Amino acid sequence: MGVSIRALHPWAVDAAEGRRLQQTLREQLCLKTPRGFRPRLVAGVDAGVVDGGRTIRAAVVVMSLPDLAVVTQSVARAPAIMPYVPGLLSFRELPGVVRALEQLDVTPELLLCDGQGIAHPRRLGIAAHLGLITDLPAIGVGKSRLVGTYREPRPEKGATSGLYDGHERIGTVLRSRDHVRPLYVSPGHRISHEDAVHWVLTCCTRYRLPEPQRAADRLASAKEAPA
């Protein structure tokens, strides 16, 4: 079954073309949650580099809601056709992520991505980009801030503070566990700011990261796992 991918552009682009594509693609983003949205399958998505930076290793872990039981998982490799360029991570990592998504035997209804959604200088972080090419609701869950200013949220789990670039809200700083560093949550595509926070918290249990993303992170970096 897998996930259907829309071929919106080639992946082999230089930095200038990548930035131009981001400016164009951002116009297609939707920050509204579909009416009656109640996902039953949520996927955590993560990717890293192996082979001295020559290969992208991507992992997707699909869990059921609300019990967060693992339904299936997928690992894939793809050549790193673009070097690391700040702000253009999606062009480097998504070819591997696409392969992993296409290998799934189920179709997730929500994607949680390690990285940014619209909390990005050109409003097209990896979660926004992935949401567009899959046409699935997608949320960026960043471990660190890429852009924007905010006030530190209170120390208890569930505390939030708006993340702003000037007067524009680009995300939410979320305390996902008591007295831990916050997460930087931003809508990617087909999800609102409020619902992005809701579903991230729904997927958080004992740890800082939401369970699907935490599982994908471990799978993407596990050298002993098949790929």
Curated annotation (Swiss-Prot):
Annotated residues for binding of Mg(2+): 46, 114
Entry keywords, A to Z: Cytoplasm, DNA damage, DNA repair, Endonuclease, Hydrolase, Magnesium, Metal-binding, Nuclease
Reaction catalysis annotation: Endonucleolytic cleavage at apurinic or apyrimidinic sites to products with a 5'-phosphate
Chief location category: cytoplasm
Subcellular location as annotated: Cytoplasm
Residues annotated as site: Interaction with target DNA: 84
Record Pfam families: Endonuclease_5
Gene Ontology cellular-component annotations: cytoplasm
GO biological process, one term: DNA repair
GO molecular-function terms, A-Z: deoxyribonuclease V activity; magnesium ion binding; RNA endonuclease activity, producing 5'-phosphomonoesters; single-stranded RNA binding
Cofactor dependency: Mg(2+)
EC number(s) reported in the record: 3.1.21.7
Highest taxon above the source species: Bacteria
Functional note: DNA repair enzyme involved in the repair of deaminated bases. Selectively cleaves double-stranded DNA at the second phosphodiester bond 3' to a deoxyinosine leaving behind the intact lesion on the nicked DNA.
Record-stated family: Belongs to the endonuclease V family.
Protein's name according to its UniProt entry: Endonuclease V
Organism (species): Alkalilimnicola ehrlichii (strain ATCC BAA-1101 / DSM 17681 / MLHE-1)
Lineage: Bacteria, Pseudomonadati, Pseudomonadota, Gammaproteobacteria, Chromatiales
